[in-house]
Amino acid sequence: MNNLLALIHPKAKHMRKISATLTVAAAALAFGALPLQVQAADDAVRIGVLTDMSGIYSDQNGSGSVTAVKMAVEDFGGKVLGKRIEVISADHQNKSDIASNLSREWFDNKKVDMIANLGPSNTALAIIEIAKQKNKIAISTGAAAIKISNEGCTPNSIHYVYDTYALANGTANAISKQGGKDWYFITADYVFGHSLEKDATDVLKTTGGRVVGSSRHAVNASDFAAFLLKAQSSGASIIALANAGGDTVNALKAANQFQITKSGKQSIAALVLFLTDVHALGLETTQGLLLTTAFYWDRTDETRKWSKRFFDRMKRMPTDAQAGDYSSTLHYLKSIQAAGTDEAGPVMAKMKATPINDMFATNGRIREDGRMIHDMYLAQVKTPAESKTPWDYFKMKAVIPAAEAFQPLSKSTCPLVNKPK
């Protein structure tokens, strides 16, 4: 038969060789004999910074987050396991569908290995789901909803900087203990705002406080007058802002305009307040506000040294999210080196097994729910007279130890957590 085929088609012998070669190659792929060739073809470790680059959360994330990630890559040496390290970035415009589409495109076509920052909670949850599907890593530094390390946890995701439990546990707890018992919430109407209001309400239940009312506003609201006047008429001693970024800035501007606190009977509580918010508003407007933060540039010699380097590039001091972008990226690269691969599973195992000690955290560690636990700090915004230099905005009031700052594993709803029966 072979001889007959050769007579009919003079190239038949050559065709049989091609067929045999393809058969061997297919078998090799089926039994995993070629992964080294596939791995060698991907000659880079790629990090994508997907965040808000132009909207209400861009000051605390944005281009500063991209800069922080690039600083970590440079400090690591620009290569890992002989591969160059590349950083790409994009603006998801705080929209979940755009975040999903971009992350899928990055994982499938750009060969991105890890996505950093993720932006607010709605986009973070969307990216985390795609990372799980593609078996890639997602590190949230810009989002706060505790859902990320609760029911939304995955084997591939890390919640690195703060969450609504830690923020409420610090600020709401401190204000309530100072006598602020009756609260009215002005809340961003999406998963982050809802989570922050709930966690703060849970704190009040343990301190003898109570909620007398709440209003919800759309993200990127321009007019807070109606919400503030309603809160004022409620008689609540504390008007709590369960929002962030530009929404917090606009709400505080309006509260100052309407002189909400002039009577001395009501106070404003900004449950999430960033260094950049204070810079935008000025100390006259923000002085005296309590806040909970994961990082402050002027806390130690190490934070000052790193922050100066950041300032030299960005002409502004870093937020805790941006400092977390640097720390988490460096920890990720060190874990690739230690694991000997950039595959998600082994790298995540190393990240969880290795303590984090740098300018951001001391003895930080990543739990099985993906929550990185570390000390948090209760701070207060300085008065104009107390501030001596540019960006000298916070005075540290107390350290909140990691074990107290974050939700205990015993209360976790993460399916990855093994609880004692």
PLM region spans:
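Twin-arginine (Tat) signal peptide motif
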Residues: 11-22
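Bacterial N-terminal signal peptides
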Residues: 23-33
